[in-house]
Design a protein with these regions (language model features):
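Activation on terminal intrinsically disordered regulatory regions flanking enzyme cores
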Residues: 146-149, 166-170
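Short acidic/polar inter-strand loop motif in beta-rich domains
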Residues: 159-167
């Protein structure tokens, strides 16, 4: 249970071939953020990018939320910042990434894909999310963003590094 939401995930690949890194963190008692990174497309730099994301992502997101009047984050601005930091860290490569933010009280899910495929199922709707261009490919981040109101959802995410299913229901 994270931020009063029941969260489950299931890797849908062999355990000896890890490739998708999933990180989920509570930002407050009402909201959480997550990302899924495919570490297989950039050699050893994929693992380094995962460590860099782990160290920076939640802090950048919390800083952004603290400095804006609106309740929902600007994931596009955040991903541009992450793309810039990957370049500053001199980490060449492609970093397919899906980023998500969920606010329990607003029942609002935001998903942004930069190179990973995803299908979102809310029970009422099933939406295919365009995979877009992986981070690190271009000098800027180009976004495929989806915003959906829901109190429960499943997201199947896949790329070169494998496939996983992430499920959430608000309590």
């Amino acid at each position: 249970v994270i931020s009063h939401c029941r969260v489950n995930y299931r890797p849908l690949v062999a355990a000896d071939k890890p490739g998708l890194v999933l990180d989920i963190a509570a930002l407050s008692e009402n909201d959480l953020a997550f990302y899924c990174l495919d570490v297989t497309r950039a050699g050893h730099n994929g693992v380094l990018a995962a460590l860099l994301l782990r160290a920076l992502f939640n802090g950048l997101l919390q800083e952004q939320l603290a400095h804006q009047n609106q309740r929902l984050p600007e994931l596009g601005a955040l991903l541009k910042q992450v793309n810039h930091l990957l370049r500053q860290a001199n980490l060449p490569g492609q970093f397919p990434l899906l980023v998500g933010y969920y606010h329990r009280e607003l029942k609002n899910l935001i998903l942004v894909s930069e190179g990973l495929n995803a299908t979102l199922n809310t029970g009422e709707h099933q939406v295919q999310i365009s995979n877009g261009v992986p981070l690190g490919t271009l000098g800027n981040a180009y976004l495929n963003q989806l915003s959906q109101r829901c109190d429960a959802w499943q997201c199947q995410i896949w790329g070169t590094g494998g496939r996983l299913r992430l499920m959430l229901s608000a309590e």
